[in-house]
Amino acid sequence: MPYLTSADNTKLYVKEWGAGPPVVLLHGWPLSSDSWDDQAMAIADAGYRAIAYDRRGFGRSDQPWSGYDYNTLADDLACVIEQTGAKDATLVGFSMGGGEVARYMSRHAGKSVVKAALISSVVPFMLKTPDNPEGTDASVFDEMTAGMKEDRAKFFAGFFKDFFGVSLLAHPTSVEQLEWARSVSMQAGLKGTLACAKSFATTDFRADLAAFNVPTLIIHGTDDKTVPINPAGRAAAKGIAGSTLIEYDGAPHGLFATHKARLTSDLLTFLGR
């Protein structure tokens, strides 16, 4: 079942590994489901069914002109859950994917979900506003948009250095990892890339947090420059009743690569509870 069809006839690429309780993995911007491969293999080996799909506009999925708002993206997730028969599923959302988890929990009342995990997630609200003073200033997102429109490949070359915490003194990932990430990001359509950036930058998920009525794990790096921890992971932990927050001291955004062994272990522990 490599492709499913969404409610608006968008084809979504889906891969399923293993058999057992379903774990649906939602990737971050601007990557694809392949970014979850290390964790998906371990999850499948541990006796679970790992389900990962490419968000519309990214990877091998269709690149429609519209549908990059979080309501539509949550509806896409609902189609994946329904058409794969993922009953009693755990949802794991990385970065932008955490927003889909949050909106699904409210918009679809958490149907078929028994656990949720938010990894380096944009939830609850990224944008700096009078009532969200620790958010990111709108000018930062405006600069991102301008950079992508001018030279997307060059923009991503710089973007992924912060994403993976690469600097003159720190090299938590290889040069090849950076090149891979940029190549995957360039597979996405420009329209979807820009529209999704606007969606994760401006969507307020604070009202969605009350819908998390299942055990919820939150993992975030304290040195995440892409999605800073204070208005994201720490704020989400305060807003989701009974959630568990694990902070990775000094860690950047791209934990699936920079801290893949620890992240995999923490996810498997959470799944086994």
Predicted segments with their positions:
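Conserved alpha/beta-hydrolase "nucleophile elbow" surrounding the catalytic nucleophile
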Residues: 27-29, 89, 93-98
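Conserved acidic catalytic loop of the alpha/beta-hydrolase fold
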Residues: 72-89
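Conserved alpha/beta-hydrolase "acid-adjacent" motif
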Residues: 225-231
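Conserved HGGG/HGGXW glycine-rich cap/lid loop of the alpha/beta-hydrolase fold
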Residues: 6-66
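Flexible "cap/lid" loop of the alpha/beta hydrolase fold
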Residues: 102-150
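Short beta-strand/loop motif that positions the catalytic acidic residue
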Residues: 212, 218-220, 224
